[in-house]
Regions:
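Conserved nucleotide-binding/hydrolysis micro-motifs of P-loop NTPases
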Residues: 11-14, 31-37, 83-87, 115-120, ...
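Intrinsically disordered, low-complexity regulatory segments
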Residues: 1-144, 214-215, 224-230, 335, ...
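Basic, low-complexity terminal or inter-domain segments flanking catalytic cores
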Residues: 2-5, 16, 25, 155, ...
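A conserved hydrophobic secondary-structure block that centers on an alpha-helix together
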Residues: 82, 254-256, 260, 265-279
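Metal- or metallocofactor-binding catalytic centers and their adjacent structured scaffolds
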Residues: 222-257, 469
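Phosphate-interacting basic helix/loop segments used at nucleotide- and nucleic-acid interfaces
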Residues: 55-78, 178-179, 267-268, 375-384, ...
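C-terminal or mid-to-C-terminal helical accessory/interaction module adjacent to the motor/catalytic core
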Residues: 72, 117-201, 245-252
């Protein structure tokens, strides 16, 4: 008979852990949270320090009964939910049901933590059990209470003022505001015309290359009309050019840190076109365990909710062995790369990485679904690249001018040649390409020329214009452009904006983005978010009634206070009160503001068509 009971959230996680442990252990799953606030009422005692009134979640009574029964049969209980706020809250609620506080002194109920589901990590955790971190429990409780207060009371107000079935959220409403604000910016935007002029030049050596007009009379080329563009074309057409200056420099491109949650969601959106929700679902599957042939259920990546880029020494050495063997010592830095941890990140956490660097994507491809494989490959490549040397590029900038114009017109071209690929041999970070909402300051803003291959050139060398089809004049092309409105958010851009403004936390981004779509406040059109009519109506009402609640700085400050609860520097009740006081004031304000339901059409003398 088992002497120890291990409790986790997920049946998949339970199966993977069972594989690594002997008969002395029994593993059970709580299948998520076992207790929560009631669905039928507020469930928070506003008069008694916001005391939450937890109840057993529907369908979980039998789960708890089974856990309690099994706990009576063993000597020790190990609570092993995920290593984050939600996991700590699950552990705490189960510990209470087992009549223990999760402290070592209870002699029976312990908390164990591991960031990866591997044999070594699990056995290491069981050898050094700890106690429930009440700071994490209180941080989760504070967030849950705040979200319930706003969701319950705020949504009731929306039902009264706008229409039934609507919801309000402490963070979701701010996310909707960002999308509505961006749409207003786009509607107010007025496009500006600008022109570019490109010369196709050739010297003594092939190939011919393009150069853009960079400056006129020493000032940035700012061509606002077609007439002005034609004046410049007339001044330079048919003239030979001369190379005025050549600037060469070596440039290093450093590797990027291994994934944290927000970066994984952004990159998966850019490169794989996954929604944050899909990314986190797949990552959870890879974390909890996939059947890998004879190995059985195997945890393939570390815990996927993290804001720390830290890598354990063991994992670092693991990566360095792979780099040395598969790429060569020239790709291996003399000392491991170390990445800075953000201010509020939990040092106990690690970055999202493979549990074994030796388990490359191709070696397990046959066991993974296509989406699982694509995400695992993204994580593996990023992790390996993070421990490689920088890429080295030779960057060349060439300025040339038409002969006889006294250097009045300077045309510039820039080319980059990769001298040593370094980490880019494995991984290149994606970008969020945005169309310009103003005139580019120079040609490199207007167009990326980094991959341009330049011929061998020397200062003073004569160049000539090369005629091609579809050119405005032989060797010259003028193009009309218009500045574009600020882009609508896609998943990657919205996550970046939420992160930069401190709204929500990486572990909540996926649910925020899913919720605002499920509520029909925003919709996706061609991969970009647009506010719906409902979203605009709700946002307009909330902006009038809840100016603080929808203020990004207020929301960010609230997140910082909740982080302080997690760090143990602020009582959770104090953090909730700091939010609740202005919330009550704004609720009173909003009650007096007319919503769509309050607006009644004035009576007319026209007969009713139905009467």
């Amino acid at each position: 008979m088992a002497k120890s009971l291990i409790i986790v959230e997920s049946p998949t996680k339970a199966r993977t852990i069972t594989k690594y442990l002997g008969r002395g252990y029994s593993v059970m799953a709580s299948v998520g949270h076992v207790k929560d606030l009631p669905t039928s009422k507020l469930g928070v005692d506003l008069e008694n320090d916001f005391e939450p009134q937890y109840v057993t979640i529907k369908g979980k009574s039998k789960v708890l009964a089974d856990i309690k029964k099994k706990a009576q049969e063993v000597d020790t209980v190990f609570l092993a939910p995920d290593p984050d706020r939600e996991g700590e809250a699950i552990a705490w609620h189960i510990a209470q049901e087992l009549h223990g506080k999760g402290k070592k002194k209870d002699g029976k109920v312990y908390r164990v933590l591991f960031n990866e589901i591997t044999e070594s990590a699990i056995k290491r955790a069981l050898k050094s059990p700890g106690e429930i971190d009440m700071k994490l429990v209180q941080a989760q409780q504070a967030r849950r209470v705040l979200d319930r207060i706003v969701g319950y009371q705020g949504s009731q107000l929306l039902w009264k003022k706008v229409r039934r079935g609507l919801s309000m959220g402490r963070v979701q409403s701010v996310a909707v505001r960002l999308i509505c604000d961006r749409e207003k910016e786009r509607e107010a935007f007025r496009a500006e015309e600008y022109w570019s002029i490109v010369a196709l030049l050739a010297g003594d050596n092939p190939p011919a290359f393009e150069a853009k007009l960079h400056s006129v009379n020493g000032q940035d080329a700012d061509i606002g009309t077609g007439e002005r563009a034609q004046q410049i074309l007339d001044a330079v057409q048919g003239k030979p050019f001369v190379v005025q200056s050549i600037e060469r420099k070596e440039k290093k491109r450093n590797p990027v840190a291994p994934f944290i949650t927000s970066r994984l969601q952004q990159e998966a959106a850019r490169k794989l076109h996954f929604s944050p929700k899909k990314t986190m679902t797949l990552a959870q599957q890879l974390y909890e365990g996939i059947e890998i042939g004879a190995e059985g259920p195997t945890g393939l990546i570390t815990y996927m909710r993290t804001d720390s880029p830290r890598i354990s020494q063991e994992a670092t050495e693991d990566a360095r062995v792979v780099i040395r063997e598969r790429f060569g010592v020239e790709y291996l830095p003399a000392t491991p790369n170390v990445y800075k941890t953000q201010k509020a990140a939990q040092e106990a956490h690690e970055a999202i990485r493979p549990t074994s660097a030796a388990r490359d994507p191709e070696s397990i491809r046959q066991y993974l679904e296509q989406d699982q494989y694509n995400l695992y490959k993204l994580i593996w490549n990023r992790f390996i690249a993070s421990q490689m040397v920088p890429a080295i590029m030779d960057v060349t900038r060439v300025d040339s001018s038409p002969v006889g114009t006294l250097d009045r017109y300077v045309f510039r071209t820039t080319g980059t040649v990769v001298k040593f690929a370094g980490h880019t041999a494995v991984y290149l970070e994606g970008t969020d390409k945005e169309l310009p909402s103003r005139k580019p300051k120079n040609e490199q803003e207007a167009e990326d020329e980094s991959d341009r291959q330049l011929p061998a050139l020397r200062e003073g060398e004569s160049l000539h214009l090369v005629a091609q089809e579809a050119q405005t004049l032989p060797g010259l092309v003028s193009k009309q452009h218009f500045t574009q409105p600020p882009p609508r958010y896609n998943e990657a851009l919205l996550i970046r904006e939420l992160e930069e403004k401190g709204i929500g936390r990486p572990s909540t981004y996926a649910s925020i983005i899913s919720t605002i779509q499920d509520r029909k406040y925003v919709e996706k059109v061609e991969g970009r978010f647009l506010p719906t009519e409902t979203g605009r109506t709700v946002n307009d009402f909330l902006l009038k009634g809840f100016p603080d609640l929808l203020d990004t700085e207020f929301t960010s400050h609230m997140e910082e206070q909740l982080d302080e609860v997690e760090e143990g520097t602020k009582p959770w009740v104090s953090a909730v009160r700091d939010f609740y006081t202005p919330f009550v004031r704004e609720m009173e304000l909003a009650q007096g503001i007319p919503g769509p339901k309050d607006i009644v059409e004035p009576p007319t003398n026209l007969p009713c068509e139905k009467c």
